[in-house]
Amino acid sequence: MKSKDWLNRQKRDHFVKKAKKKGYLSRAAFKLVEIENKYKVIEKSKYVLEFGASPGGWSQVVLEVNPRIKITALDVLDFKLNHPNVFFHKEDYLNFNYDKLKKNFDLIL
């Protein structure tokens, strides 16, 4: 998709407008909201590992559902969410040293 086409789609997209209204960093947040409403995977978790975490929309949802949860987020792109419970690593998940985490995760996104 060309940049111009993508921008035009973004302007018309219902979920883009809804995300801005709710303060979400991305429209993808609503996908995780639907998953959580159906399966309740976030509220039971303590530690989350999130791949492809940029810009931070899913992390926002995770923290809304469970404010005490700890999130380890990985992405090669910039992460826009600043929160004390989110530990962001700007790295490729294929090259990341997982041994340094020293914890088990309840949920992987």
Please name every model-derived segment:
Residues M1-K44:
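Class I SAM-dependent methyltransferase Rossmann-like catalytic core
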Residues L32, G52, I108:
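Residue-level signature of catalytic and energy-coupling elements of molecular machines
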Residues Y39, N66, N97:
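Active-site catalytic pocket residues across diverse enzymes, especially alpha/beta-hydrolases
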Residues K44-S54:
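Conserved class I S-adenosyl-L-methionine
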Residues Y47, R68-K70:
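Residues at the starts of beta-strands that form the adenosine-phosphate
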Residues P55-P67:
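Conserved SAM-binding loop of SAM-dependent methyltransferases across substrates and taxa
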Residues L74-L109:
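S-adenosyl-L-methionine
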